[in-house]
From Swiss-Prot:
E.C. number(s) listed in UniProt: 3.4.13.21
GO biological process: proteolysis
InterPro entries found in the cross-reference section: Class_I_gatase-like, Peptidase_S51, Peptidase_S51_dipeptidase-E
A Gene Ontology term for the protein's cellular component: cytoplasm
GO molecular function, one term: peptidase activity
Protein name: Peptidase E
Localisation: Cytoplasm
Main subcellular location of this protein, as a coarse class: cytoplasm
Transmembrane parts of this sequence: none
Domain of life per record: Bacteria
Enzyme class, spelled out: hydrolase
């Protein structure tokens, strides 16, 4: 399988998806036809989200079709060379994909060789479940099971920083709480600016920041770019 799982879409001082474009270009390998899954968009219309994505990827020669705009979305996915899943609200994303019967077709086409690109919620959707999302509002997706294209759980936008005076839990504390009730999980705290690529059977960490792996009853393990999972 070929996957590009990004923690986020925008870095300070850079345009939207600017840091991701070289990574996308490297993994295209001649693929040009993409379907875009815009359902995580809550505060922007799906048409606008699709147009924004298409404009950014046009210089790479990628044509983008919004899955919400086609008559037969399952067929569109089955014939896609690239599946792109945008960030936003993970619950809404999974709910829409499940209701439209898109989860199995996405899994199948990626396993047959299509490239999967997802940022934030799109990275969450590639995991076994969406239980490590940070998102609100919460809508009921009729279960948390997701695509299971990547075998570990990703927590995008990972940071342990707290505003001065804030008394709420750190992100690590929240992850530790999840590991108490679900000790079987392995969770990757993926900071903004970092990503995971899967190619030729290897998953590799990229990006400038330290990533952390959390398991129940164990200390967090720091990982740097180049680590293979």
């Amino acid at each position: 399988m070929e996957l590009l799982l990004l923690s986020n879409s925008t870095l300070p001082g850079k345009a939207w998806l600017e840091h991701a474009l070289p990574l996308i270009a490297e993994q295209l390998q001649g693929r040009r036809s993409a379907v875009f899954i815009p359902f995580a968009g809550v505060t922007q219309t799906w048409d606008d989200y699709t147009a924004k994505t298409a404009a950014v990827l046009a210089p790479l020669g990628v044509s983008v079709t919004g899955i919400h705009s086609v008559v037969d979305p399952v067929a569109a996915i089955e014939n896609a060379e690239i599946v792109i899943v945008g960030g936003g609200n993970t619950f809404q994303l999974l709910k829409q994909c499940r209701e439209r019967g898109l989860l199995a077709p996405i899994t199948d086409v990626v396993k047959r060789g299509a490239l999967y690109i997802g940022w934030s919620a799109g990275a969450n959707l590639a995991c076994p479940t969406i239980r490590t999302t940070n998102d609100m509002p919460i809508v009921d997706p009729q279960g948390f099971d997701a695509l299971n294209l990547f075998p570990l759980q990703i927590n995008p936008h990972f940071t342990n920083a707290l505003p001065e005076g804030h008394k709420g839990e750190t992100r690590e504390q929240r992850i530790r709480e999840l590991l108490v009730v679900a000790p079987e999980l392995t969770i990757i705290g993926l900071p903004e600016g970092n990503w995971i690529t899967v190619s030729k059977g290897h998953a590799t960490l990229g990006g400038p920041n330290t990533t952390y792996v959390f398991k129940a009853g164990e200390e967090a393990v720091p990982l740097e770019a180049g680590h293979r999972f």
